[in-house]
Every structure is written in C-alpha cells, then in structure tokens.
C-alpha cells in the first residue's frame, strides 16, 4: 500500500540538451510519461519562442487534416482507429508530411469544385430537358388564346383574379395572339403560388402564367430533393420582359430560352439528352475517384493525426525550454518521481543515441522550495477509487491519501443504504461482465461518456455489488422478502385450538386479529439468536419497522462515529509526517478527547444497551433492572448529560425490602422493589452523573485548547525568526499576519466542534436511505408481482410472465438499481468528502501532469477529457 498511501517523492530536475538531440530526447520522455516540464518562458508570448515556426507548420497541417476529416464525415465513411504504436516522426520528415497533406487537400478541393460545376450543369440540362418536354403542351393554340384573352381584360381594366378553364366563347375583344411574348423556365413548387401572385399584382394581370410539375428528379447526385415546376409566362412588349426576368431572379427561378419552332425544339431536346447522359457518366466517374481518395485518406487519417499530435506536442514542449547564449544548448526543468529518475535517465540516453549526437543529455537534481505536484502510482483497480477522492480535491504533497480506505468504506456505506441481496446480485453480474470483457471493450474504444463513466468505475461497482449482497443478507432482504436459511429463533407459544377459534372469530366479525409473541416464552433461548443477520420472522411482523428502524438508526450512528474517529486517527499520520508536535499535542489530542467524551461515549452506551438490557429482569452493574420498560433512553440521557440534570441513582428503590410494591423473579428468586418515576431516564451504572460531568468538562476544555494554543505557538516561533509551516499547501505566500492565523484556526475549531454534531446526524442518511430502498422494493413487490401470483389458471401464468419479465424486471432495474443506486452512490460520496475526509484531508494539492503521449492520444481519440 506504500505508494498509494502517500504520494510519491518528487524531485525537481534540470536537464541540459544539445540542440540536435533535444527533439529525440523529449520524444523518448513522452513515450515514458514520467516528466512534468515547467514553462521557463512564461514572460514570452507564443510568437517569440524558438520553435514558433514549427508549431505554425503543425497548425497548418492540423487544419488540413481537419478538412480531410470533414470531407470523410460528410460522405459517411467510417474512420478506423489505429492501434499500432507510432514513433514520433523526425523533424526532417515534416516537409514530406506537409507535401502529402497539401497534395491531398488540393486534390479534394479541385474535385469538389469540379463536382459542383458538373452537378450544376447536369441539373440545368435536366431542367432544360423538362422544359422542352412540357413546353409543347404549354404553347398550344388554346393556351395562347387563353393568355391573350386574360391580358386583353387586364388592358381594359376588367381583369379579376387569374382563373383557369375559361370558356372558348368570349364576346369581348382580344389582343392578337401573334403579339404575345413568352418566357419559360423552372421554379420550385413551394414558391410557385407566391411567384404567380407576385407576377399578377406587379404586372396588373398583364402576365399570364401556367405551371406543370416535373415528375422526373432533376438533382440525381444530391440527397436533398425538392419538387419543381415548369412555367411559361405570356406577356406583351419587351419592356415587360425585363420586369418578368427580374421577378424570376428574385424567386430563384431559372429561365431557359426555347425556340418557337417545334422542329428546332425537337432537335435541341435530342442534343440535350445526349449531353445529359455524357454528363452523368462524367460525374459518376468523378465521384468514384473522389470516393477512392476519401477511403484511402480515411484508412490513414488516425495515423496522420497521431503523428502530427506527437510532432506538435514535442515542439510545444521544446518551447518551454530556455536557450543559452550560444543557441546550442536547451535547458529544461521538470518534476520527476524520485523512484523513476533512473528510467528518465535511460530515456535521455536512448534519445541521444537515436539522434546520433555524441553529447549526452545531462540531468541534475535540484534543491528547491517550490511546492511539488502530487502523484500516486495506480492500477486499473485503484484508479476508480482515486478518481472519487480527486473529484473532491487533489491531495497535498505527501498527505495521507483517503483512497486506500475508500476502497473498503465507500462500497460498504453504499451497501448499508442499498442493502438488498437480489439487487446486489444484478449489480455484481453487470460489473463482472465489464471486468471479464474489459480487454475487448477497451479495444472497441467506445466514446460514449455515460458508458465510459460506468466502465471506468467497473471495479467500484463490482465491490458495491458484493457489499450489497453482504448487507442484504445482514438485513435478510432479498427483493423485499426474507430467506429462512438457518431456521427462526422464534416459536409459536399458542396452541392450535386457540388459533383456530380466533381465526373463526375474525372471519365472523370480518376483522384481522393479531397476536403478540412474548419474548420470554416465544424466543428460543436454547437456540439463541439467528446465526447471521435479521431473523426472517420479522418480515411477517406488524411491528417490523418498529424493530428495524431503531436497529438501523443506532447502527448508522456507530458506523458514522467510527469513521469520523478513524479520520481523526489518520490526521495523526499527517502531523507525524509534517513533524508538527504542536498539532499532535494541542490539536489531535483535544479533538480525540472532544469526540471521545461525547460521541464515542454515546456509541459505548448503544453497545451496552444492546448487550445488557434485555426483556428479562436482571442485576446489571449491581443494580436491579426490572424489565424492558426501564431500558435507558439514550437520546434524552445525552440531553440530560449536557444539562447536568440530577437523576436517581438506579431504576428502583426499596429493592429486596418489605417496602417494595412490586416484585420480579431474578435468577429464580423473588425480588421486591418500588420503581422510580421515569425509570428509563435514571442512572444505569454507578456514578454515572459524575462520569458524565467529567467527560463534559474535558470536552469543553478541549475547545479553547484547539482554538488558542497553536496560533500563539506560531506567533512565538515567528517572533524568534523560526520557520513557520501554516499548512496552506501551494498557496502559502505573503507576510505573517497573526489575525489571519487566528481566524483560520477559529474556523477550523468551530467547523470541527459543530461538525461532530452535524456529521453524526448526517450519518443517519444510512438509515433513511436503507428504509426508503426497502419500502420501495416492498411496494414494487406488492403492487406488481404479488397481483400476478394471486391469479390462477392460464391467466395467472400469462400475468406472471408479462408482469415479471416486462414490468417487475424493468422497474427493478430502472428504479431500484439505477435510480436508488445513484442516490446511494451520491450520498456515500458526500459522507466520504464531508464527514470523513474533512477530519484529515486538505485536498489543495497540484496534480502531477507529465508529458505523456498515451494521455495526449486518448484525449485526441475522445476517450479522456
């Protein structure tokens, strides 16, 4: 547990590179991923650094790759991932890469340009073809006469809305048909009505329009298809022709010149059909060639992207180095884990060899006051739990890491709230599938964020499922039902005749009669308690919640105070690691005393009440305990402790004397006694009031000790010029200010004192969520599955199948596992972040972010953020 218990020792190193070997050495360090470089040129802008031209060339190549990727995506061509290792390309190969990408870009741009022109020409030819095919019917004598009559009416001011199907006999004078001019073209069908109305209004009905829909598709090489219409516009006069063409341009209607001679139109139509066929063949060949280029580019795109990514990242890293006056040596500073310095030196040696340089890179370890970054060596199992801790804050350098303890406590507290063995089995199966097929799933490189969240935490979910099964057996809860594995410790004390008579009486009166099992005779004392978990008989009891709720509530308090106490113990490890005697003596010990004198004392009371105070009368701590009615009330007792309220010294007086008013049998002997008023509030062990008064005084005195001693100690050290560690992490700067230190210590003291109370209450969420999950599971069983089980015959079989497989299963997974599981997961995170980690964890450190090709490539592939 060494490396994950505390962060790795870090060293600030200075490396001297020869200019000709710097690139290859940095490439080797990128493959190793163990050096976090520091920018030594922060005061310089990006345009004045040494390798700015190389970075610009990389940016231009990146733009070209993005353009190619957009073209590939536009054609819906899949881009395969590249899984083989690709070494970083040499700087001398940049020219070749640029030439290849520039050639590909120019080729695609030219193909796109030619395709666009060819497609436009092809559309125009098809539209011209449609116009020629329909213009004969539009230019028939009937249409011309109809147009002439309409325009004549408009000229005399008698025109109304344009109408079709006019009678041949019309007694009004008409304009000569030979004087009519016409314009033909194509317009989108969706604009035809607006086009016609606009022409009618602007020309005052002196333009006559007719439309025929084109049945044949005119855009064969486009995914977008719009219906179009052939139109013909009749009018008189060349002046009106100019207006008509402007309107056509405004409605994006294309006008085509059509010969009036039918023979010429026929000849032109044949010619256009030949051109259309030839144009289609040319476009198909062009698109086929483009498709080959796109598929070839898609095969190598990820490879080019990774090569460029490594190239650019190396030059970006080199720009962080300082250059000596001779311009022949680069100087870098970086953080390296102390245990991996040997590997870094070996990578520098390999880089020098591969570059062909005769002068090796030199690494020197530096002494520094800079705050080191935090680095833990993790594996695929511990990574998920460390992510939970890091989401709160990065650990301070060499601070105790909560992750090792979170591996056990987090899934356990989750299971306390989730506790159902049946649902835990489903969760375990799902997580096991992730673990078993993890290599295959990793190779698939799934980029879905929700999937990656579950897959990244697969070992967390695996332990959550295991612990949920464990707590499910503790609660004896399996899909809201209990399982009788070992046999109940409770027996029926009533004879069958009495039960039969009561059953008949209940049936006659239409009421449900309930019986109470007296623990003195119904509990099998020889068999003892149920061997593991809750006795299954409680699942049948009416007062089931009256029994389970106090048990779960007290268990929550015990678990919560235990975890908080453990967190304070871990703070001792931080104080020892920091060699801070004042924190150990005047912070840690008062915290232990405050927590122990009040809350640990409460936990001891809970345990003693469970162990000693049974339903049977007995002598406990030398005092008569009359029975369960005198079992101590812990909550009111704790309040009386703070109020220093006087109480009787025992549960009863006049014990064993003739003055006793009541009697009980203890160890086979009759014992008389007179019970005290509110016996459950009285003292239940000798000198309880004195002990609690001492504990309360110790807790009260601990508060000013925590508040005052450390600030005045720091002030004393500062007055003598000694080193002061304020424990503020990497942001510890500025002059000494006693007021700030006093306020800081007061905040921590108040937070701890009030937090002990609020955090203890916060752990009651363990009980609340466990109750909610159990009740939801019971409701789902009662409302869904039990209804189908009560149905008989074929209908019952069908109901079981339908309700179980399609309703009960879906609701169980969606509500009880996913939603309730997420709720319990979030509450478990809160308990660890606030209640547990606040006792010892600073979380203000700096994450170690080494220059690592693996990390950069995963971000490029969309697998990491």
Swiss-Prot record:
Parts of the chain on the Cytoplasmic side: 1-409, 475-556, 605-623, 710-798
MF-aspect GO terms: ATPase binding; proton-transporting ATPase activity, rotational mechanism
Sequence ranges on the Extracellular membrane side: 431-453, 578-583, 645-688, 820-865
Family of this protein: Belongs to the V-ATPase 116 kDa subunit family.
Membrane topology field: Multi-pass membrane protein
UniProt subunit comment: V-ATPase is a heteromultimeric enzyme made up of two complexes: the ATP-hydrolytic V1 complex and the proton translocation V0 complex. The V1 complex consists of three catalytic AB heterodimers that form a heterohexamer, three peripheral stalks each consisting of EG heterodimers, one central rotor including subunits D and F, and the regulatory subunits C and H. The proton translocation complex V0 consists of the proton transport subunit a, a ring of proteolipid subunits c9c'', rotary subunit d, subunits e and f, and the accessory subunits vah-19/Ac45 and vah-20/PRR.
Keywords: Cell membrane, Coiled coil, Glycoprotein, Hydrogen ion transport, Ion transport, Membrane, Transmembrane, Transmembrane helix, Transport
Segments crossing the lipid bilayer: 410-430, 454-474, 557-577, 584-604, 624-644, 689-709, 799-819
Location of this chain's protein in the cell: Apical cell membrane
Glycosylation sites recorded in the entry for this protein: 578, 670, 687
GO BP of this protein: nematode larval development; vacuolar acidification
Keyword hit for Transmembrane helix: yes
Source organism: Caenorhabditis elegans
Pfam family, one: V_ATPase_I
Coiled-coil ranges from the UniProt annotation: 51-121
Protein role: Subunit of the V0 complex of vacuolar(H+)-ATPase (V-ATPase), a multisubunit enzyme composed of a peripheral complex (V1) that hydrolyzes ATP and a membrane integral complex (V0) that translocates protons. V-ATPase is responsible for acidifying and maintaining the pH of intracellular compartments and in some cell types, is targeted to the plasma membrane, where it is responsible for acidifying the extracellular environment. In the intestine, required for the rhythmic defecation behavior by promoting acidification in the gut lumen following defecation.
Phenotype of the disrupted gene, per the record: RNAi-mediated knockdown causes larval lethality at the L1 stage. RNAi-mediated knockdown at the L1 larval stage causes reduced growth rate. The progeny of the few that reach adulthood is arrested at the L1 larval stage. Rhythmic defecation behavior is altered; the defecation cycle period is extended and animals have a slight arrhythmia. In the intestinal epithelium, pH oscillates once per cycle as in the wild-type, but the oscillations are diminished in amplitude and cells are relatively acidic. Also, luminal pH oscillations are reduced.
Gene Ontology cellular component terms for the protein in this record: apical part of cell; apical plasma membrane; plasma membrane; vacuolar proton-transporting V-type ATPase complex; vacuolar proton-transporting V-type ATPase, V0 domain
Protein name, UniProt field: V-type proton ATPase 116 kDa subunit a 3
Broad class of where this protein is predominantly found: membrane
């Amino acid at each position: 547990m060494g490396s994950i218990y505390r962060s790795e020792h870090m060293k600030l190193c200075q490396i001297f590179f020869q200019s000709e070997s710097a690139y290859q050495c940095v490439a080797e360090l990128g493959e190793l991923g163990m050096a976090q470089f520091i920018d030594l040129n922060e005061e310089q802008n990006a345009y004045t650094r040494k390798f700015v031209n190389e970075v610009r060339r990389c940016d231009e190549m990146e733009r070209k790759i993005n353009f190619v990727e957009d073209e590939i995506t536009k054609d819906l061509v899949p881009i395969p991932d590249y899984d083989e290792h690709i070494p970083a390309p040499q700087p001398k190969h940049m020219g070749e890469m640029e030439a290849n990408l520039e050639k590909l870009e120019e080729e695609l741009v030219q193909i796109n340009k030619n395709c666009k022109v060819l497609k436009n020409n092809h559309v125009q030819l098809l539209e011209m073809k449609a116009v020629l095919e329909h213009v004969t019917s539009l230019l028939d004598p009937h249409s011309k006469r109809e147009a002439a009559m309409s325009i004549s009416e408009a000229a005399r001011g008698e025109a109304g809305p344009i109408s079709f199907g006019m009678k041949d006999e019309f007694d009004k004078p008409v304009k000569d048909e030979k004087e009519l001019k016409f314009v033909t073209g194509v317009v989108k069908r969706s604009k035809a009505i607006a086009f016609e109305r606009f022409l009618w209004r602007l020309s005052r009905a002196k333009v006559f329009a007719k439309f025929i829909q084109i049945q044949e598709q005119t855009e064969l090489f486009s995914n977008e298809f719009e219906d179009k219409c052939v139109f013909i516009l009749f009018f008189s006069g060349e002046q009106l022709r100019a207006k008509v063409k402007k309107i056509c341009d405004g409605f994006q209607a294309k006008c085509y010149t059509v010969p009036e001679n039918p023979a010429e139109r026929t000849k032109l139509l044949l010619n256009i059909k030949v051109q259309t066929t030839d144009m289609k063949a040319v476009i198909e060949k062009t698109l086929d060639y483009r498709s080959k280029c796109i598929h070839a580019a898609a095969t190598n795109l990820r490879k080019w992207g990774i090569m460029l990514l490594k190239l650019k990242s190396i030059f970006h890293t080199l720009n962080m180095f300082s250059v000596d006056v001779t311009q022949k040596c680069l100087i870098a500073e970086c953080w390296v884990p102390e245990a991996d310095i040997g590997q870094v030196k070996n990578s520098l040696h390999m880089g020098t060899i591969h570059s062909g340089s005769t002068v090796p890179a030199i690494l020197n370890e530096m002494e520094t006051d800079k705050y080191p970054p935090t680095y833990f060596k993790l594996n695929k199992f511990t990574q998920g739990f460390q992510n939970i801790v890091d989401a709160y804050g990065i650990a301070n350098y060499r601070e105790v890491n909560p992750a090792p303890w979170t591996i056990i406590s987090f899934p356990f507290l989750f299971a306390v709230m989730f506790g159902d063995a049946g649902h835990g089995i489903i969760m375990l199966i799902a997580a096991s599938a992730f673990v078993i097929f993890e290599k295959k799933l990793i190779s698939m490189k799934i980029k879905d964020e929700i999937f990656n969240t579950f897959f990244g935490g697969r070992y967390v979910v695996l332990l959550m499922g295991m612990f949920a099964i464990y707590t499910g057996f503790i609660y004896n809860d399996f899909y809201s039902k209990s399982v009788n594995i070992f046999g109940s410790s409770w027996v029926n004390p009533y004879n069958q005749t009495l039960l039969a008579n009561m059953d008949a009486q209940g049936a006659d009166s239409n009421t449900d009669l309930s019986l109470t099992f007296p623990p003195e005779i119904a509990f099998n004392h020889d068999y003892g308690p149920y061997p593991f978990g809750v006795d299954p008989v409680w699942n049948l009891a009416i007062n089931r919640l009256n029994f389970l709720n106090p048990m779960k509530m007290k268990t929550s308090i015990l678990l919560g105070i235990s975890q908080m106490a453990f967190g304070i113990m871990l703070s001792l490890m931080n104080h020892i690691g920091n060699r801070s005697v004042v924190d150990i003596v005047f912070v840690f010990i008062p915290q232990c005393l405050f927590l122990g004198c009040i809350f640990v004392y409460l936990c001891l009371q809970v345990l003693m009440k469970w162990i000693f105070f049974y339903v049977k009368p007995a002598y406990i701590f030398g005092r008569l305990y009359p029975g369960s009615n005198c079992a101590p009330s812990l909550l009111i007792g704790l309040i009386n402790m703070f109020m220093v309220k006087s109480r009787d010294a025992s549960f009863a007086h006049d014990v064993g004397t003739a003055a006793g008013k009541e009697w009980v049998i203890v160890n086979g002997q009759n014992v008389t006694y007179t019970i005290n008023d509110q016996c459950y509030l009285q003292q239940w062990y000798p000198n309880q009031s004195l002990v609690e008064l001492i504990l309360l005084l110790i807790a009260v005195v601990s508060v000013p000790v925590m508040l005052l001693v450390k600030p005045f100690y720091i002030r004393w050290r500062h007055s003598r010029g000694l080193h002061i560690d304020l424990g503020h992490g990497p942001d510890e700067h500025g002059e000494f200010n006693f007021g700030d230190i006093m306020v800081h210590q007061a905040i921590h003291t108040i937070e701890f004192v009030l937090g002990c109370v609020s955090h203890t209450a916060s752990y009651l969420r363990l009980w609340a969520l466990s109750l909610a999950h159990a009740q939801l599971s019971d409701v789902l069983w009662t409302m869904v599955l039990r209804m189908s089980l009560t149905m008989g015959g074929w209908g019952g079989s069908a109901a079981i199948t339908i309700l179980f497989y399609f309703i009960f299963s879906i609701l169980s997974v969606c509500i009880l596992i996913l939603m309730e599981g997420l709720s319990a997961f979030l509450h478990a995170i809160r308990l660890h972040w606030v209640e547990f980690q606040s006792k010892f964890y600073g979380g203000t450190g700096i994450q170690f972010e080494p220059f690592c090709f693996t990390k950069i490539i995963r971000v490029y592939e969309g697998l990491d953020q």
